Amino acid sequence: MAPRTMYDKIWDAHLVEMAEDGTGLLYIDRHLVHEVTSPQAFEGLRMAKRQVHAPQKTLAVADHNVPTTDRSKGIADEESRIQVETLEHNAQDFGVEYLQMSDIRQGIVHIVGPEQGFTLPGTTIVCGDSHTSTHGAFGALAHGIGTSEVEHVLATQTLIQSKAKNMRINVVGKAPEGFTAKDIVLAIIGEIGTAGGTGYVIEYAGEAIRDLSMEGRMTVCNMTIEGGARAGLIAPDDKTYAYLEGRPRAPKGKAWEMAVEYWKTLPSDPDAKFDKEITIDIANLPPLITWGTSPENVIKITDRIPDPKDVADPSHAKSMQRALDYMGLTPGTPINEVKIDRVFIGSCTNGRIEDLRAAAVIAEKAIKAGRKVASTVNAMVVPGSGLVKEQAEKEGLDKIFLEAGFEWREPGCSMCLAMNADKLAPGERCASTSNRNFEGRQGRGGRTHLVSPAMAVAAAIEGHFTDVREFGN
Protein backbone atom coordinates (compact mmCIF):
# COMPACT_ATOMS: atom_id res chain seq x y z
CA MET A 1 0.00 0.00 0.00
CA ALA A 2 1.26 3.48 -0.88
CA PRO A 3 2.15 5.82 2.00
CA ARG A 4 -0.95 7.59 3.31
CA THR A 5 -1.70 10.81 5.14
CA MET A 6 -3.68 10.78 8.38
CA TYR A 7 -6.69 12.12 6.47
CA ASP A 8 -6.37 9.30 3.93
CA LYS A 9 -6.28 6.71 6.71
CA ILE A 10 -9.39 8.00 8.48
CA TRP A 11 -11.26 8.40 5.19
CA ASP A 12 -10.39 4.86 4.09
CA ALA A 13 -11.42 3.40 7.46
CA HIS A 14 -14.87 5.01 7.23
CA LEU A 15 -15.63 4.68 3.53
CA VAL A 16 -18.75 2.57 3.01
CA GLU A 17 -18.77 2.88 -0.78
CA MET A 18 -17.75 5.16 -3.62
CA ALA A 19 -20.33 6.38 -6.11
CA GLU A 20 -19.77 6.72 -9.85
CA ASP A 21 -19.69 10.51 -9.49
CA GLY A 22 -16.67 10.24 -7.21
CA THR A 23 -18.44 10.99 -3.94
CA GLY A 24 -18.07 8.66 -1.00
CA LEU A 25 -20.51 7.45 1.61
CA LEU A 26 -18.77 7.82 4.99
CA TYR A 27 -19.75 6.21 8.27
CA ILE A 28 -20.08 8.81 11.04
CA ASP A 29 -18.87 7.81 14.51
CA ARG A 30 -20.02 10.85 16.51
CA HIS A 31 -22.78 13.40 16.00
CA LEU A 32 -23.00 16.55 18.13
CA VAL A 33 -26.30 18.44 18.07
CA HIS A 34 -27.28 21.92 19.26
CA GLU A 35 -30.46 23.98 19.26
CA VAL A 36 -29.97 26.11 16.15
CA THR A 37 -29.44 23.64 13.29
CA SER A 38 -31.34 20.61 14.61
CA PRO A 39 -35.08 21.50 14.87
CA GLN A 40 -35.84 21.03 11.16
CA ALA A 41 -33.77 17.84 11.09
CA PHE A 42 -35.72 16.22 13.92
CA GLU A 43 -39.01 17.40 12.39
CA GLY A 44 -37.97 15.75 9.12
CA LEU A 45 -37.51 12.46 10.98
CA ARG A 46 -40.99 12.79 12.47
CA MET A 47 -42.61 13.47 9.13
CA ALA A 48 -40.87 10.45 7.59
CA LYS A 49 -41.65 8.32 10.66
CA ARG A 50 -37.96 7.56 11.17
CA GLN A 51 -35.94 7.09 14.35
CA VAL A 52 -32.41 8.24 15.18
CA HIS A 53 -30.24 5.42 13.84
CA ALA A 54 -27.62 5.48 16.64
CA PRO A 55 -28.77 7.61 19.59
CA GLN A 56 -25.80 6.40 21.67
CA LYS A 57 -23.50 8.10 19.13
CA THR A 58 -25.38 11.38 19.34
CA LEU A 59 -24.96 14.05 22.02
CA ALA A 60 -27.15 17.16 22.31
CA VAL A 61 -26.42 20.39 24.17
CA ALA A 62 -27.81 23.93 23.96
CA ASP A 63 -25.14 26.61 23.67
CA HIS A 64 -25.86 29.35 21.10
CA ASN A 65 -28.98 30.84 22.70
CA VAL A 66 -28.46 30.17 26.39
CA PRO A 67 -28.19 33.13 28.79
CA THR A 68 -24.86 33.72 30.52
CA THR A 69 -26.41 35.68 33.39
CA ASP A 70 -28.84 34.45 36.09
CA ARG A 71 -30.42 31.30 34.66
CA SER A 72 -33.02 30.99 37.38
CA LYS A 73 -35.00 33.55 35.40
CA GLY A 74 -35.03 31.34 32.30
CA ILE A 75 -34.49 32.62 28.76
CA ALA A 76 -36.05 36.03 28.17
CA ASP A 77 -36.02 36.02 24.36
CA GLU A 78 -38.96 33.97 23.10
CA GLU A 79 -37.30 32.65 19.94
CA SER A 80 -34.21 31.55 21.87
CA ARG A 81 -36.35 29.91 24.55
CA ILE A 82 -38.36 27.99 21.94
CA GLN A 83 -35.19 26.71 20.26
CA VAL A 84 -33.72 25.44 23.54
CA GLU A 85 -37.01 23.86 24.65
CA THR A 86 -37.43 22.24 21.25
CA LEU A 87 -33.99 20.64 21.48
CA GLU A 88 -34.83 19.20 24.89
CA HIS A 89 -38.14 17.79 23.65
CA ASN A 90 -36.54 16.34 20.52
CA ALA A 91 -33.79 14.69 22.55
CA GLN A 92 -36.39 13.11 24.84
CA ASP A 93 -38.58 11.94 21.95
CA PHE A 94 -35.71 10.35 20.03
CA GLY A 95 -33.70 8.94 22.95
CA VAL A 96 -30.68 11.20 22.54
CA GLU A 97 -28.61 12.25 25.57
CA TYR A 98 -29.19 15.95 26.29
CA LEU A 99 -27.15 18.11 28.65
CA GLN A 100 -29.63 20.68 29.91
CA MET A 101 -28.74 24.16 31.16
CA SER A 102 -28.75 23.08 34.80
CA ASP A 103 -26.26 20.25 34.10
CA ILE A 104 -22.69 21.00 35.23
CA ARG A 105 -21.53 19.39 31.96
CA GLN A 106 -23.45 21.88 29.79
CA GLY A 107 -21.43 24.26 27.68
CA ILE A 108 -20.30 25.01 24.16
CA VAL A 109 -20.66 21.83 22.14
CA HIS A 110 -17.03 21.87 20.93
CA ILE A 111 -15.75 22.12 24.48
CA VAL A 112 -18.19 19.57 25.90
CA GLY A 113 -17.33 16.86 23.35
CA PRO A 114 -13.64 16.57 24.31
CA GLU A 115 -14.38 16.99 28.04
CA GLN A 116 -16.69 13.99 27.97
CA GLY A 117 -14.35 11.80 25.92
CA PHE A 118 -17.00 11.79 23.19
CA THR A 119 -14.27 13.09 20.88
CA LEU A 120 -11.70 10.39 20.10
CA PRO A 121 -8.77 10.02 17.66
CA GLY A 122 -9.47 8.36 14.34
CA THR A 123 -13.21 8.99 14.51
CA THR A 124 -15.45 10.91 12.13
CA ILE A 125 -17.33 13.70 13.91
CA VAL A 126 -19.97 16.05 12.55
CA CYS A 127 -22.16 18.82 13.92
CA GLY A 128 -24.37 21.47 12.38
CA ASP A 129 -21.74 24.07 13.19
CA SER A 130 -18.72 25.18 11.15
CA HIS A 131 -16.32 25.10 14.10
CA THR A 132 -16.64 21.33 14.44
CA SER A 133 -13.11 21.40 13.04
CA THR A 134 -12.05 21.95 16.69
CA HIS A 135 -12.15 18.19 17.32
CA GLY A 136 -9.42 17.65 14.74
CA ALA A 137 -6.98 18.49 17.54
CA PHE A 138 -7.44 14.87 18.66
CA GLY A 139 -6.73 13.38 15.25
CA ALA A 140 -10.43 13.10 14.43
CA LEU A 141 -11.89 13.95 11.01
CA ALA A 142 -14.37 16.58 12.13
CA HIS A 143 -16.32 19.19 10.20
CA GLY A 144 -19.57 21.13 10.11
CA ILE A 145 -22.65 20.07 8.17
CA GLY A 146 -25.92 21.69 7.08
CA THR A 147 -29.38 21.05 8.50
CA SER A 148 -30.38 18.58 5.76
CA GLU A 149 -27.16 16.68 6.44
CA VAL A 150 -27.93 16.70 10.17
CA GLU A 151 -31.16 14.86 9.35
CA HIS A 152 -29.31 12.43 7.07
CA VAL A 153 -26.79 11.57 9.80
CA LEU A 154 -29.52 11.20 12.43
CA ALA A 155 -31.39 8.81 10.15
CA THR A 156 -28.51 6.78 8.69
CA GLN A 157 -25.29 7.51 10.64
CA THR A 158 -23.68 8.16 7.25
CA LEU A 159 -22.82 11.18 5.12
CA ILE A 160 -22.14 11.68 1.41
CA GLN A 161 -18.84 13.49 0.91
CA SER A 162 -16.33 14.41 -1.77
CA LYS A 163 -12.78 13.66 -0.74
CA ALA A 164 -10.67 16.75 -0.17
CA LYS A 165 -7.03 17.30 -1.11
CA ASN A 166 -4.25 17.09 1.50
CA MET A 167 -2.43 20.15 2.82
CA ARG A 168 0.22 20.18 5.53
CA ILE A 169 1.12 23.35 7.41
CA ASN A 170 4.39 23.06 9.31
CA VAL A 171 4.68 25.58 12.13
CA VAL A 172 8.30 25.76 13.18
CA GLY A 173 10.23 27.57 15.89
CA LYS A 174 9.67 28.00 19.61
CA ALA A 175 6.78 30.27 20.51
CA PRO A 176 8.25 33.56 21.79
CA GLU A 177 6.98 35.46 24.84
CA GLY A 178 3.34 36.46 24.56
CA PHE A 179 2.77 34.31 21.47
CA THR A 180 -0.04 31.80 21.99
CA ALA A 181 -2.00 29.18 20.08
CA LYS A 182 -4.39 31.96 19.02
CA ASP A 183 -1.46 33.87 17.55
CA ILE A 184 -0.33 30.74 15.71
CA VAL A 185 -3.66 30.31 13.96
CA LEU A 186 -3.92 34.04 13.21
CA ALA A 187 -0.44 33.83 11.67
CA ILE A 188 -1.58 30.90 9.53
CA ILE A 189 -4.73 32.65 8.31
CA GLY A 190 -2.83 35.87 7.74
CA GLU A 191 -0.44 33.87 5.54
CA ILE A 192 -2.82 31.69 3.50
CA GLY A 193 -5.92 33.93 3.56
CA THR A 194 -9.52 32.90 4.15
CA ALA A 195 -9.59 30.96 0.86
CA GLY A 196 -6.15 29.38 1.17
CA GLY A 197 -7.46 26.07 2.48
CA THR A 198 -10.45 25.76 0.15
CA GLY A 199 -10.76 22.19 -1.11
CA TYR A 200 -8.27 20.84 1.43
CA VAL A 201 -8.12 19.10 4.76
CA ILE A 202 -5.22 20.67 6.65
CA GLU A 203 -2.81 18.70 8.80
CA TYR A 204 -0.95 20.90 11.29
CA ALA A 205 2.56 19.73 12.10
CA GLY A 206 5.93 20.98 13.28
CA GLU A 207 7.66 21.79 16.54
CA ALA A 208 5.32 24.62 17.53
CA ILE A 209 2.24 22.42 17.11
CA ARG A 210 3.72 19.51 19.06
CA ASP A 211 4.64 21.92 21.87
CA LEU A 212 1.01 23.00 22.29
CA SER A 213 -1.25 21.60 24.99
CA MET A 214 -4.48 19.93 23.90
CA GLU A 215 -6.31 23.20 24.65
CA GLY A 216 -3.91 25.05 22.37
CA ARG A 217 -4.31 22.48 19.62
CA MET A 218 -8.08 22.87 19.84
CA THR A 219 -7.68 26.63 19.37
CA VAL A 220 -5.67 26.09 16.18
CA CYS A 221 -8.03 23.48 14.71
CA ASN A 222 -11.05 25.56 15.71
CA MET A 223 -10.17 28.31 13.23
CA THR A 224 -9.35 25.96 10.35
CA ILE A 225 -12.64 26.98 8.76
CA GLU A 226 -11.53 30.64 8.81
CA GLY A 227 -8.60 29.53 6.64
CA GLY A 228 -11.01 28.09 4.07
CA ALA A 229 -10.53 24.39 4.84
CA ARG A 230 -13.34 22.18 6.03
CA ALA A 231 -11.30 20.21 8.55
CA GLY A 232 -7.97 20.37 10.35
CA LEU A 233 -6.01 17.53 11.90
CA ILE A 234 -3.22 17.15 14.44
CA ALA A 235 -1.66 13.73 14.95
CA PRO A 236 -2.47 12.18 18.34
CA ASP A 237 0.40 11.66 20.77
CA ASP A 238 1.00 11.13 24.49
CA LYS A 239 -0.60 14.51 25.29
CA THR A 240 -3.75 13.37 23.50
CA TYR A 241 -3.92 10.08 25.39
CA ALA A 242 -3.26 11.76 28.75
CA TYR A 243 -6.07 14.25 28.13
CA LEU A 244 -8.59 11.54 27.20
CA GLU A 245 -7.76 8.80 29.70
CA GLY A 246 -10.46 8.49 32.33
CA ARG A 247 -12.95 10.77 30.56
CA PRO A 248 -16.57 9.57 31.00
CA ARG A 249 -17.08 8.35 27.42
CA ALA A 250 -13.51 7.30 26.65
CA PRO A 251 -12.72 3.56 26.42
CA LYS A 252 -11.80 1.79 29.67
CA GLY A 253 -9.51 -1.09 30.62
CA LYS A 254 -8.52 -3.42 27.79
CA ALA A 255 -10.58 -1.37 25.33
CA TRP A 256 -8.46 1.68 26.21
CA GLU A 257 -5.22 -0.21 25.56
CA MET A 258 -6.53 -1.44 22.21
CA ALA A 259 -7.70 2.04 21.29
CA VAL A 260 -4.32 3.61 22.01
CA GLU A 261 -2.58 0.96 19.91
CA TYR A 262 -4.87 1.84 17.00
CA TRP A 263 -4.47 5.58 17.54
CA LYS A 264 -0.70 5.19 17.26
CA THR A 265 -1.17 4.02 13.65
CA LEU A 266 -3.01 7.22 12.63
CA PRO A 267 -0.16 9.73 12.03
CA SER A 268 0.75 10.31 8.40
CA ASP A 269 3.29 7.88 7.00
CA PRO A 270 6.81 9.38 6.67
CA ASP A 271 6.69 9.32 2.85
CA ALA A 272 3.04 10.38 2.50
CA LYS A 273 2.50 12.91 -0.27
CA PHE A 274 0.63 16.15 0.36
CA ASP A 275 -0.92 18.18 -2.45
CA LYS A 276 0.36 21.36 -0.82
CA GLU A 277 2.84 22.15 1.98
CA ILE A 278 3.47 25.44 3.77
CA THR A 279 6.00 26.31 6.46
CA ILE A 280 5.52 29.18 8.91
CA ASP A 281 8.27 30.24 11.32
CA ILE A 282 6.91 31.85 14.49
CA ALA A 283 10.21 32.18 16.38
CA ASN A 284 10.44 35.97 16.07
CA LEU A 285 6.79 37.02 15.83
CA PRO A 286 5.10 39.40 18.30
CA PRO A 287 1.46 38.93 19.37
CA LEU A 288 -1.04 39.35 16.52
CA ILE A 289 -4.40 41.08 16.12
CA THR A 290 -6.99 41.56 13.38
CA TRP A 291 -7.76 45.07 12.17
CA GLY A 292 -10.57 44.58 9.62
CA THR A 293 -13.67 42.53 8.92
CA SER A 294 -12.02 39.30 7.82
CA PRO A 295 -9.89 36.89 9.87
CA GLU A 296 -7.15 37.30 7.25
CA ASN A 297 -6.79 41.00 8.14
CA VAL A 298 -3.96 40.17 10.56
CA ILE A 299 -1.20 42.53 11.70
CA LYS A 300 1.38 42.58 14.48
CA ILE A 301 0.54 44.48 17.65
CA THR A 302 3.56 46.65 16.80
CA ASP A 303 2.13 47.57 13.36
CA ARG A 304 0.01 50.44 12.07
CA ILE A 305 -3.38 50.21 10.37
CA PRO A 306 -2.65 49.43 6.69
CA ASP A 307 -3.40 51.86 3.87
CA PRO A 308 -5.35 50.75 0.76
CA LYS A 309 -3.18 53.15 -1.27
CA ASP A 310 -0.26 50.79 -0.69
CA VAL A 311 -2.09 47.92 -2.41
CA ALA A 312 -1.76 47.45 -6.17
CA ASP A 313 -4.89 45.34 -6.70
CA PRO A 314 -7.91 47.72 -7.04
CA SER A 315 -10.46 45.16 -5.80
CA HIS A 316 -8.32 44.38 -2.75
CA ALA A 317 -7.88 48.10 -2.06
CA LYS A 318 -11.64 48.59 -2.32
CA SER A 319 -12.36 45.80 0.17
CA MET A 320 -9.75 47.24 2.52
CA GLN A 321 -11.39 50.66 2.36
CA ARG A 322 -14.80 49.16 3.10
CA ALA A 323 -13.32 47.39 6.13
CA LEU A 324 -11.65 50.59 7.34
CA ASP A 325 -14.91 52.52 6.99
CA TYR A 326 -16.88 49.87 8.88
CA MET A 327 -14.25 49.59 11.60
CA GLY A 328 -13.89 53.37 11.95
CA LEU A 329 -10.12 53.24 11.52
CA THR A 330 -7.63 55.58 9.87
CA PRO A 331 -4.66 54.20 7.90
CA GLY A 332 -1.33 54.77 9.61
CA THR A 333 -2.75 54.72 13.13
CA PRO A 334 -0.69 52.50 15.46
CA ILE A 335 -2.98 49.60 16.36
CA ASN A 336 -1.86 49.87 19.98
CA GLU A 337 -3.42 53.34 20.17
CA VAL A 338 -6.90 52.17 19.12
CA LYS A 339 -9.35 52.48 22.03
CA ILE A 340 -11.90 49.81 22.87
CA ASP A 341 -15.32 49.66 24.53
CA ARG A 342 -15.80 45.96 25.26
CA VAL A 343 -13.79 42.82 25.97
CA PHE A 344 -15.06 39.28 25.47
CA ILE A 345 -13.05 36.32 26.77
CA GLY A 346 -14.62 32.97 25.90
CA SER A 347 -16.01 31.02 22.89
CA CYS A 348 -15.13 27.60 21.48
CA THR A 349 -11.83 29.15 20.40
CA ASN A 350 -10.60 30.39 23.79
CA GLY A 351 -13.06 29.39 26.51
CA ARG A 352 -11.12 26.53 28.12
CA ILE A 353 -9.42 26.41 31.51
CA GLU A 354 -5.96 27.07 30.05
CA ASP A 355 -7.31 30.20 28.34
CA LEU A 356 -8.81 31.48 31.58
CA ARG A 357 -5.58 30.78 33.46
CA ALA A 358 -3.59 32.77 30.91
CA ALA A 359 -6.06 35.64 31.16
CA ALA A 360 -6.00 35.53 34.97
CA VAL A 361 -2.20 35.88 35.01
CA ILE A 362 -2.48 39.29 33.35
CA ALA A 363 -5.49 40.29 35.46
CA GLU A 364 -3.61 39.43 38.65
CA LYS A 365 -0.63 41.43 37.45
CA ALA A 366 -2.93 44.43 37.07
CA ILE A 367 -4.41 43.96 40.54
CA LYS A 368 -0.96 43.89 42.12
CA ALA A 369 -0.21 47.17 40.37
CA GLY A 370 -3.39 48.68 41.82
CA ARG A 371 -5.19 48.66 38.48
CA LYS A 372 -8.38 47.18 37.07
CA VAL A 373 -10.53 47.25 33.92
CA ALA A 374 -10.57 50.79 32.50
CA SER A 375 -13.64 52.84 33.42
CA THR A 376 -14.50 53.18 29.72
CA VAL A 377 -14.51 49.41 29.13
CA ASN A 378 -17.06 46.69 29.85
CA ALA A 379 -15.33 43.30 30.07
CA MET A 380 -16.72 39.80 30.53
CA VAL A 381 -15.29 36.32 31.00
CA VAL A 382 -17.52 33.47 29.84
CA PRO A 383 -16.29 29.93 30.63
CA GLY A 384 -16.78 27.45 27.80
CA SER A 385 -18.57 24.88 29.96
CA GLY A 386 -19.89 24.27 33.44
CA LEU A 387 -16.87 22.07 34.15
CA VAL A 388 -14.49 24.83 33.05
CA LYS A 389 -16.36 27.27 35.29
CA GLU A 390 -16.22 24.84 38.22
CA GLN A 391 -12.47 24.28 37.79
CA ALA A 392 -11.78 28.00 37.44
CA GLU A 393 -13.67 28.70 40.65
CA LYS A 394 -11.76 25.95 42.47
CA GLU A 395 -8.57 27.73 41.44
CA GLY A 396 -9.93 31.13 42.48
CA LEU A 397 -9.78 32.56 38.96
CA ASP A 398 -13.29 33.98 39.26
CA LYS A 399 -12.21 36.06 42.25
CA ILE A 400 -9.24 37.44 40.30
CA PHE A 401 -11.45 38.43 37.39
CA LEU A 402 -14.09 40.01 39.61
CA GLU A 403 -11.51 41.96 41.60
CA ALA A 404 -9.99 43.20 38.35
CA GLY A 405 -13.38 44.48 37.18
CA PHE A 406 -14.51 41.72 34.83
CA GLU A 407 -17.97 40.16 34.80
CA TRP A 408 -17.96 36.41 35.56
CA ARG A 409 -20.64 34.65 33.53
CA GLU A 410 -22.36 31.30 33.01
CA PRO A 411 -21.15 29.05 30.14
CA GLY A 412 -22.34 29.46 26.56
CA CYS A 413 -21.44 30.85 23.15
CA SER A 414 -22.22 34.34 24.45
CA MET A 415 -20.83 37.30 22.51
CA CYS A 416 -19.10 35.19 19.87
CA LEU A 417 -22.22 35.73 17.79
CA ALA A 418 -25.29 37.94 18.04
CA MET A 419 -27.79 35.16 18.82
CA ASN A 420 -28.29 35.77 22.53
CA ALA A 421 -28.44 38.69 24.95
CA ASP A 422 -24.67 39.33 24.82
CA LYS A 423 -24.22 41.75 21.91
CA LEU A 424 -22.27 44.81 20.88
CA ALA A 425 -24.13 48.06 20.30
CA PRO A 426 -23.58 49.81 16.95
CA GLY A 427 -20.12 51.37 16.84
CA GLU A 428 -18.79 49.56 19.90
CA ARG A 429 -15.28 48.16 19.49
CA CYS A 430 -14.45 44.80 21.10
CA ALA A 431 -11.25 42.91 21.85
CA SER A 432 -12.55 39.37 21.42
CA THR A 433 -11.04 35.91 21.87
CA SER A 434 -13.58 34.43 19.45
CA ASN A 435 -13.03 33.34 15.85
CA ARG A 436 -14.86 35.71 13.50
CA ASN A 437 -14.71 39.47 12.96
CA PHE A 438 -17.26 39.78 10.16
CA GLU A 439 -19.52 42.83 9.91
CA GLY A 440 -22.27 42.45 12.51
CA ARG A 441 -20.92 39.18 13.90
CA GLN A 442 -21.14 40.34 17.54
CA GLY A 443 -24.04 42.71 16.98
CA ARG A 444 -25.23 45.04 14.23
CA GLY A 445 -22.59 47.71 13.68
CA GLY A 446 -20.24 46.12 16.22
CA ARG A 447 -16.50 46.20 15.54
CA THR A 448 -14.55 43.05 16.39
CA HIS A 449 -10.80 42.56 16.78
CA LEU A 450 -9.56 38.98 17.32
CA VAL A 451 -6.86 38.51 19.96
CA SER A 452 -5.56 35.99 22.49
CA PRO A 453 -6.97 35.90 26.05
CA ALA A 454 -3.87 37.58 27.50
CA MET A 455 -4.02 40.34 24.90
CA ALA A 456 -7.72 40.84 25.64
CA VAL A 457 -7.08 41.35 29.35
CA ALA A 458 -4.24 43.79 28.70
CA ALA A 459 -6.53 45.80 26.41
CA ALA A 460 -9.28 45.81 29.03
CA ILE A 461 -6.95 47.29 31.65
CA GLU A 462 -5.36 49.89 29.37
CA GLY A 463 -8.57 50.85 27.58
CA HIS A 464 -6.84 50.34 24.24
CA PHE A 465 -4.93 47.60 22.45
CA THR A 466 -1.50 47.04 23.89
CA ASP A 467 1.44 44.67 23.56
CA VAL A 468 0.94 42.16 26.37
CA ARG A 469 4.71 41.65 26.52
CA GLU A 470 5.08 45.21 27.79
CA PHE A 471 2.01 45.19 30.03
CA GLY A 472 2.85 46.36 33.53
CA ASN A 473 6.44 47.24 32.69
Swiss-Prot record:
<dbReference type="InterPro" id="IPR001030">
    <property type="entry name" value="Acoase/IPM_deHydtase_lsu_aba"/>
</dbReference>
<comment type="function">
    <text>Catalyzes the isomerization between 2-isopropylmalate and 3-isopropylmalate, via the formation of 2-isopropylmaleate.</text>
</comment>
<keyword id="KW-0004">4Fe-4S</keyword>
<dbReference type="GO" id="GO:0051539">
    <property type="term" value="F:4 iron, 4 sulfur cluster binding"/>
</dbReference>
<comment type="similarity">
    <text>Belongs to the aconitase/IPM isomerase family. LeuC type 1 subfamily.</text>
</comment>
<dbReference type="GO" id="GO:0009098">
    <property type="term" value="P:L-leucine biosynthetic process"/>
</dbReference>
<protein>
    <recommendedName>
        <fullName>3-isopropylmalate dehydratase large subunit</fullName>
        <ecNumber>4.2.1.33</ecNumber>
    </recommendedName>
</protein>
<dbReference type="GO" id="GO:0046872">
    <property type="term" value="F:metal ion binding"/>
</dbReference>
<keyword id="KW-0432">Leucine biosynthesis</keyword>
<dbReference type="InterPro" id="IPR018136">
    <property type="entry name" value="Aconitase_4Fe-4S_BS"/>
</dbReference>
<dbReference type="InterPro" id="IPR050067">
    <property type="entry name" value="IPM_dehydratase_rel_enz"/>
</dbReference>
<dbReference type="InterPro" id="IPR036008">
    <property type="entry name" value="Aconitase_4Fe-4S_dom"/>
</dbReference>
<keyword id="KW-0479">Metal-binding</keyword>
<dbReference type="InterPro" id="IPR033941">
    <property type="entry name" value="IPMI_cat"/>
</dbReference>
<dbReference type="GO" id="GO:0003861">
    <property type="term" value="F:3-isopropylmalate dehydratase activity"/>
</dbReference>
<keyword id="KW-0411">Iron-sulfur</keyword>
<feature type="binding site">
    <location>
        <position position="413"/>
    </location>
    <ligand>
        <name>[4Fe-4S] cluster</name>
    </ligand>
</feature>
<keyword id="KW-0100">Branched-chain amino acid biosynthesis</keyword>
<feature type="binding site">
    <location>
        <position position="348"/>
    </location>
    <ligand>
        <name>[4Fe-4S] cluster</name>
    </ligand>
</feature>
<feature type="binding site">
    <location>
        <position position="416"/>
    </location>
    <ligand>
        <name>[4Fe-4S] cluster</name>
    </ligand>
</feature>
<keyword id="KW-0028">Amino-acid biosynthesis</keyword>
<keyword id="KW-0408">Iron</keyword>
<comment type="subunit">
    <text>Heterodimer of LeuC and LeuD.</text>
</comment>
<comment type="pathway">
    <text>Amino-acid biosynthesis; L-leucine biosynthesis; L-leucine from 3-methyl-2-oxobutanoate: step 2/4.</text>
</comment>
<keyword id="KW-0456">Lyase</keyword>
<dbReference type="InterPro" id="IPR004430">
    <property type="entry name" value="3-IsopropMal_deHydase_lsu"/>
</dbReference>
<dbReference type="InterPro" id="IPR015931">
    <property type="entry name" value="Acnase/IPM_dHydase_lsu_aba_1/3"/>
</dbReference>
<dbReference type="Pfam" id="PF00330">
    <property type="entry name" value="Aconitase"/>
</dbReference>
